[in-house]
Amino acid sequence: MTHWFHRNPLKATAPVSFNYYGMITGPPASKICNDLRSARTRLLELFTDLSCNPETMKNAADLYFSLLQGFINSVGDSTQESKLRYIQNFKWTDTLQGHVPSAQQDAVFELISMGFNVALWYTKYASRLAGKENITEDEAKEVHRSLKIAAGIFKHLKESHIPKLLTPAEKGRDLEARLIDAYIIQCQAEAQEVTIARAIELKHAPGLIAALAYDTASFYQKADHTLSSLEPAHSAKWRKYLHLKMCFYTAYAYCYHGQTLLASDKCGEAIRSLQEAEKLYAEAEALCKEYGETKGPGPTAKPSGHLFFRKLGSLVKNTLDKCQRENGFIYFQKIPTEAPQLELKANYGLVEPVPFEFPPMSAHWTPEALAAFDLTKRPKDDSVKPKPEEDVKPVKEPDIRPQKDTGCSVS
């Protein structure tokens, strides 16, 4: 289902030449710098290459990160800092902040920022794959796994590398806790959407589907709350998406909970549960329109136009009609004024991030290679840093045209 997921733009970066004239005193260092330059260029190109798959991305990312490790950790002792950590200035934009970049003279900042973009690529790959016509079961599994991988990368950056930065992230920037938490939670929620779609397709028990939907809605609510203290100019569009998904999956939870109640001969409560689903579905429809009219980063998803979205509206209406008929002929139960409390706990299908680690240092980093970088020969004017306020050219992302909606239930 194309354009079902909201995606913020990729981070853009200034070119890095890895040219250290005068400092390089031997072929091993020269080769490493050449390899770094080509590996970085290749990885940046793959972010917008529609033919790129997870295997290609992993290989390219591992190559670059393994080479970059020599600028972060000392050769032969990963607990010691490399003498090269602070020799290069890196500039990266942020997903919500337009073209004005952040800049730090720190290889750890480069590792985190490029890793962040790799995670974003996995989310965009998942969205693109989910938008294919006639998506297969294996492709649905790949969507699910890609979102879990992305969550794992974001989580690893947050826990293991962002704390190492000497300059803390500014408020509203990608490496700030609120934003990276929102990305982690959104990835988990979207992966669970795939689980829900699968459970519906296989006609699992309504109680399980209701619990999964409720848990997913809670994820979206948590992500929205995480962003609530950000500047609305930057976060309003993203938050509208999170809010509409929260309403949509809460409606799903009430709909399937109503089916569970009806099966237990609690027809009056079932009607009230489905009335709540009907109200929340209408709210989600209204939020879809508001989301489409809200300005902000990223292309606009169009969830209300999808059969998966519309199917819920039909399901709620038909199930509510059935319950009302049954109550009029068989049960004659009073309909509660308050909607039932959803105290649902899913025991299956819950999504956890796939654990992630950066690759070990490249074998090209030997004591001889490190010694071939002579910092005493660093040019005196090398301390002149690029101005961080200079704009960085945005990434030109490919336009993903919506394909025919077949009603495939992989959301």
Swiss-Prot record:
Composition-biased stretches (Basic and acidic residues): 375-404
Q: Which InterPro entries match?
A: BRO1_dom, BRO1_sf, BROX
Q: Which SMART domains match?
A: BRO1
Q: Which UniProt keywords are given for this protein, alphabetically ordered?
A: Lipoprotein, Membrane, Methylation, Nucleus, Prenylation
Question: S-farnesyl cysteine lipidation sites on this chain?
Answer: C408
Instruction: Outline the extent of the BRO1 domain.
Output: 90-408
Q: Which GO terms describe its cellular component?
A: nuclear envelope; nuclear membrane
Region described as Disordered:
375-411
One Pfam short name: BRO1
Locate the Cysteine methyl ester modifications and list their residues: C408
- Propeptide residues? 409-411
Q: Does the keyword Lipoprotein apply?
A: yes
Mainly localized where? nucleus
Task of the protein: Nuclear envelope-associated factor that is involved in the nuclear envelope ruptures during interphase (NERDI) repair, where it is locally recruited by CHMP5 and reduces cytoskeletal stress through its action on SYN2 to help reseal the ruptured membrane.
Could you say which protein family the record assigns here?
Belongs to the BROX family.
Q: Please describe the quaternary structure of this protein.
A: Monomer. Interacts with CHMP4B. Interacts with CHMP5: this interaction allows the recruitment of BROX to cellular membranes. Interacts with SYN2; this interaction promotes SYN2 ubiquitination and facilitates the relaxation of mechanical stress imposed by compressive actin fibers at the rupture site.
Which PANTHER family does its entry note? BRO1 DOMAIN-CONTAINING PROTEIN BROX
Q: What name goes with this protein? A: BRO1 domain-containing protein BROX
- Organism of this sequence: Mus musculus (Mouse)
Q: What is the gene called? A: Brox
